[in-house]
Structures are given as structure tokens and as C-alpha cells.
């Protein structure tokens, strides 16, 4: 509890003890009416002086209609009618509800702060063989910092020395450690688990991943959802309306009674009007709706899903169309050897020859061959390298001529080669003028991609579409394997934007379209869709800037998880609105009819608020979605 909350708690306890004492004494001793009034004023002012002060300032500043005004009028009115206990009790229970709400909101904020506890307090710099702690803001680009086991990585950079495991769970929601060694890029916010590592910084602290993420989460509350805006407007008109309704309830029925010759019953109708005022307090809705979105954004952050505002969370919950980029989203975006079909020599030797022949090339295919070979390249074994544009390469390896390339290269050399029906890039190999076999290289599908498509369907997505610049046979194979509904291949970036616009025109107004890409090459499409989702954005400034929602790792399952989180959050928002307004409507009618007394009014106000706040906090719990 904060100091302010502790003070309120002490006031609540003192006031409650005084009320109980007065009731007990009053049951045994006859107390003079004026003395009783004076005695009850003590707990009343102890518990309610701040509410009365706020109500007075509201009237003074011409901002009359708020919950403080409602409580002040209701309690002063009850006391004026001689209902001292009820007047003080209404103020007491209102303050109990306010304390609970303050504590719950504070707790949810602390939970989110703990979930996103990635802000580093210091950076270690080595000076004369000793580590010195400095403020991360003071560290310049190119400085070598030291991170020891258990410490947070304070600034983005490249590992220059050491090996370690990193806990990235605060960023990605994943508990599996990430291994790093010299030469690997590393981002701020991770926790070093094992070895000491030295990192050469590549950014200033203010531009580091950790700073961008924290700014994003902290600023998310400024972008209001339609539901929040509706509640704000609703409260703006609702509170004056119920005040005037209560005034009418206090005046009109007694006047009608007088006209028809019955006793006016002013006391009865004023009491009903005061009960009406207490019931009508809109706290439950006004507090619980923003709190639900706040908790939902915090829970999503814990799962490695960064949402830039509650408006995006609300839009995401209505997503019916999901369009994907293929490379880096559904596939790893890295070429790998997926098949070796030897003809005259064994597979390992075939890969070795291809890796050596292609070793001077910087093409991704060359890198995949060297990765498959898995050993260092001895450049002294290679000579007479000749690259033939659009065909491949011819080189001498250990004095023997090796040709590695596509079918055009084999045709140029007059060699017959084996056609391969499998989809992928084929690298044909010839050794001393004789066809030796071919290697199949492909962009590998991520292990969770197929499950991700199934999860999207279960989350209510109507259609999945893949957009790619790849050849049609490659694109079709990936789409068929994953169960994607539609696929468009050989697209330029502008073509992708056109396709997104085409689907935007097809869908209904209530249905929303999300585009998922890597956030770097897909910025125009991300900004054109109803919701732009950037995947695998750890360390990618472009992704964080371009998208509405940022997935911190490259697991496609997170797309469905983000949608499920948004649906749960919106469900809680609607539950609170319907529950709070429903209970209040029933109690308002009962209060106007004289069936509900002030104690029922206290439940309709404080009780409903407590239940709604507790329900809102459920939005933090997203682990099992």
C-alpha cells in the first residue's frame, strides 16, 4: 500500500469504530437529537472531508456532475432527513470501494511493471582493469560494456568476447534461453544467465530496443478504444441526467400527491431520490473499462505481444482476414539444403564440391551450401574461379573442374542432367565434364506454422491469404502444406498493397483485416491494413515503427495468441459494461419505487465496482490462451 492508501485505511477504521460505538451507546442510552447529530458528524467528516472538498471545488470550477457531487448530495441529504447512520455508512462504503479500486489499479500497474521489468539500472564499463557502473544514458556508441551473470543487457550491441545463455522471456514470453557467442548481435532487456560477455554498443540507450519497448507500452494507454471513448461520452451525459432525474423524483411525486389531495410525503420521496443518486454513480463502468484494456495490454506484453494502444486491441478482436508475407513469417527466411541427390559420387563429397565451388559467392544459396558442409573452406584448394551470370560458377577444386549452377549451366556445358520434381532451388554439380548430381535448396517452413494456421481458424479467422514474391510452384507448395486458403505469388511490394486493398473492399465494415510481415520490407502494407502486425521484431527499429502490434519473436503461433488475448479483453469489457449497467438499471427502478433502500444502493455502487474491477484484472491472465 502507498502512504496515501494507508491514510485512507486508517480513516476508514476510525470512522467504522466510531459508527459502531455510537450505535452501541445509542441502543442503551437516550441521546439528545442535537448531540446525536454532532457525534455522527465526527465519523462523517473523518471519512468524507476529501469528497466534500472535491464536490465543492467541482461546483466552484463549474464541473459539477461527478461521483464526488453525487456522494456529497446523497449523504448530506440522508443526514438532513435524520438518517445519520445511513448517511455516514454511504460515505464509508464509498471510500472502501475507492480504496479497493486504487489498490487494484496500483497492483495491476505493478504487475505490468514487473512483467516488463527490463529497464537496466546501470552499465558496466571496464576502467584500468576494474568494472565501473555508469548510467546507461552516458554510454556512447562503440563503447565496450561488460555484462556479468544475472545482469540485464543495458544497450543493444555485438558480442566481442565470451559466450553465454540469455533469458529473453521479458521480451518474447519464451522461457527457452538463447545462446550467444562472439560476433552475435544482442539486444537490451535480456538477462545474462551464465558467462561474462563483452558487448560493443551499436546504439545509444535512448534508441535501444528496451527504451523503444518501454515507451511503446507506457504510451499505449493514450490511444483510446471505441469502448473507452463511448464510456467517457456516456459518463459526460449520464451523470447530469441522473442528477436531474433524482431532483424530479424528489419534487414531482409530492406535488402530484398534493394536487390529488394526498399527503405530499416529501421525506419519503427525497429519501428515494438520494438512494437513486447513490445507485447511479458510474464508477464501476468508468474505472473497469480502461483498467480492462490496461491489463490486457500488460498481459499481452508478458506474452511477447506489444500492442501500441487499446484501439488496436479492440480492432484485432474483430479480425476475420489474415494476410501473410511468406518469407520470415511462415518460413524461416533462410535457405537450407533439404535434399542431396547424388549420381556418380557420394552425398558428402557432392556437398563439399558445391561448397568449395560457391565459396567466393555472397549469394544466400552459397551460404546454405557452406552451412551444410559444416567445415572451414581451405581457399588454397580452389583456383580459376569463373562466375557465369544467371547460370552459376565453374572453378577448379584440387585441380579438378567443378561446375555448380542451374540447368542453364548444364545445357551450356552440353551435359544431360536429372530433372527434379521437388519444389525448391536446384544446384546441379558436374565434375570434370561428367554430371555428378544435384542439391535441393529451399526456404524451410517454421515448425509451428501449420499449427498457427489451425489456431487462427479456431480463433475465428475466416480466411488466411499468403502474399509472396516467390515463384508460383514454391508458394503453392507452402500454402498447401500449411492449409492456407489462398495464395498469390510473384508479387512486387506494390502488388501486395493492391491485394490488401482488394480484400479490404471485399470485407464488411465490421470485419477487420490484419497483415503480418517482417516489418522491414512490408511497411507500406502494414500501414494499409486495418491492423499491421510485425513479427520477429527483436532489435528491428523498422518493425516497431511500422506496425500497430509487434510480436517480439518469430513464432507464428503468436498471431493467434494476440487475437485470443484481444478477444478475452474485449469480452471482459463487455461483461463489465452489461453487468454494471444492468445491476444499476434494476436497482434504479427498485429505488424509485421505494423497494431498494440505501443499503441496496451501497451494493449497487461499491459492490458492483469491486466485482467489475476484479473481473477487469482477469485480462492480465493470458498464459493459457
Q: At which residue positions do the language-model features occur?
A:
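N-terminal membrane topogenic signal
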Residues: 1-14, 238
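Bilayer-spanning, highly hydrophobic alpha-helical transmembrane segments
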Residues: 16-17, 229-260, 272-293, 574-603
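Actuator/coupling domain of P-type ATPases
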Residues: 23, 40-126, 138-145, 152, ...
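Juxtamembrane helix-loop transition segments at the membrane interface in multi-pass membrane proteins
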Residues: 56-66, 103-113, 291-310, 619-625
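Conserved catalytic phosphorylation-site environment of P-type ATPases
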Residues: 67-72, 171, 271, 281-357, ...
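Membrane-embedded transport module
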Residues: 245, 506-510, 547, 552-625
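P-type ATPase nucleotide-binding
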Residues: 337-463, 472, 484-500
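Conserved ATP-binding TGD loop and adjacent catalytic N/P-domain core of P-type ATPases
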Residues: 399, 425, 431-575
Amino acid at each position: 500500500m502507498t502512504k496515501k492508501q494507508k491514510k485512507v485505511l486508517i480513516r476508514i477504521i476510525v470512522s467504522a469504530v466510531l459508527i459502531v460505538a455510537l450505535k452501541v451507546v445509542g441502543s442503551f442510552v437516550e441521546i439528545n437529537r442535537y448531540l446525536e447529530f454532532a457525534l455522527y458528524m465526527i465519523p462523517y467528516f473523518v471519512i468524507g472531508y476529501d469528497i466534500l472538498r472535491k464536490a465543492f471545488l467541482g461546483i466552484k470550477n463549474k464541473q459539477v456532475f461527478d461521483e464526488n457531487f453525487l456522494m456529497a448530495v446523497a449523504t448530506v441529504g440522508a443526514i438532513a432527513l435524520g438518517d445519520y447512520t445511513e448517511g455516514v455508512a454511504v460515505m464509508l462504503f464509498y471510500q472502501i470501494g475507492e480504496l479497493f479500486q486504487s489498490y487494484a489499479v496500483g497492483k495491476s500497474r505493478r504487475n505490468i511493471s514487473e512483467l516488463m521489468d527490463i529497464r537496466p539500472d546501470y552499465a558496466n564499463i571496464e576502467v584500468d582493469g576494474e568494472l565501473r557502473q555508469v548510467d546507461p544514458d552516458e554510454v556512447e556508441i562503440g563503447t565496450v560494456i561488460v555484462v556479468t551473470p544475472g545482469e540485464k543487457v543495458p544497450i543493444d550491441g555485438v558480442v566481442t568476447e565470451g559466450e553465454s545463455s540469455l533469458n529473453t522471456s521479458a521480451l518474447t514470453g519464451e522461457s527457452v534461453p538463447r545462446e550467444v557467442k562472439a560476433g552475435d548481435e544482442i539486444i537490451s532487456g535480456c538477462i545474462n544467465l551464465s558467462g561474462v560477455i563483452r558487448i560493443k554498443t551499436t546504439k545509444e540507450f535512448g534508441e535501444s530496443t528496451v527504451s523503444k519497448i518501454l515507451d511503446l507500452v507506457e504510451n499505449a494507454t493514450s490511444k483510446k478504444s471505441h469502448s473507452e471513448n463511448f464510456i467517457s461520452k456516456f459518463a459526460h451525459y449520464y451523470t447530469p441526467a441522473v442528477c436531474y432525474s433524482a431532483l424530479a423524483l424528489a419534487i414531482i411525486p409530492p406535488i402530484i400527491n398534493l394536487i390529488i389531495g394526498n399527503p405530499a410525503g416529501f421525506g419519503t420521496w427525497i429519501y428515494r431520490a438520494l438512494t437513486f443518486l447513490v445507485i447511479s454513480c458510474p464508477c464501476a463502468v468508468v474505472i473497469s473499462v480502461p483498467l480492462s484494456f490496461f491489463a490486457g495490454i500488460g498481459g499481452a506484453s508478458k506474452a511477447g505481444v506489444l500492442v501500441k494502444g487499446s484501439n488496436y486491441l479492440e480492432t484485432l478482436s474483430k479480425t476475420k482476414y489474415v494476410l501473410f508475407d511468406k518469407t520470415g513469417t511462415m518460413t524461416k527466411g533462410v535457405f537450407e539444403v533439404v535434399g542431396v541427390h547424388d549420381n556418380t559420387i557420394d552425398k558428402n563429397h557432392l556437398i563439399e564440391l558445391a561448397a568449395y565451388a560457391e565459396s567466393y559467392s555472397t549469394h544466400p544459396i552459397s551460404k546454405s551450401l557452406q552451412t551444410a558442409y559444416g567445415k572451414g573452406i581451405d581457399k588454397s584448394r580452389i583456383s580459376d574461379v569463373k562466375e557465369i551470370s544467371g547460370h552459376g560458377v565453374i572453378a577448379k577444386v584440387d585441380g579438378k573442374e567443378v561446375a555448380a549452377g542451374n540447368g542453364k549451366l548444364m545445357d551450356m556445358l552440353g551435359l544431360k542432367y536429372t530433372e527434379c520434381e521437388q519444389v525448391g532451388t536446384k544446384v546441379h554439380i558436374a565434375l570434370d565434364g561428367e554430371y555428378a548430381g544435384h542439391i535441393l535448396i529451399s526456404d524451410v517452413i517454421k515448425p509451428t506454422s501449420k499449427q498457427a494456421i489451425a489456431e487462427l481458424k479456431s480463433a475465428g479467422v475466416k480466411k488466411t491469404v499468403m502474399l509472396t514474391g516467390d515463384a508460383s510452384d514454391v508458394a503453392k507448395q507452402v500454402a498447401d502444406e500449411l492449409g492456407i486458403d489462398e495464395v498469390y505469388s510473384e508479387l512486387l511490394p506494390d502488388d501486395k498493397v493492391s491485394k490488401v486493398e482488394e480484400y479490404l473492399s471485399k470485407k464488411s465494415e465490421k470485419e477487420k483485416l490484419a497483415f503480418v510481415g517482417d516489418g522491414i520490407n512490408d511497411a507500406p502494407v502494414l500501414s494499409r491494413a486495418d491492423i499491421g502486425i510485425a513479427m520477429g521484431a527483436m532489435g528491428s527499429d523498422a518493425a516497431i515503427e511500422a506496425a500497430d502490434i509487434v510480436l517480439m519473436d518469430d513464432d507464428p503461433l503468436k498471431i493467434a495468441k494476440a487475437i485470443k488475448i484481444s478477444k478475452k479483453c474485449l469480452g471482459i469489457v463487455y461483461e463489465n459494461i452489461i453487468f454494471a449497467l444492468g445491476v444499476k438499471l434494476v436497482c434504479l427502478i427498485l429505488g424509485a419505487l421505494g423497494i431498494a433502500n440505501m443499503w441496496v444502493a451501497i451494493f449497487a455502487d461499491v459492490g458492483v465496482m469491486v466485482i467489475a474491477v476484479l473481473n477487469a484484472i482477469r485480462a492480465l491472465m493470458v498464459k493459457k490462451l
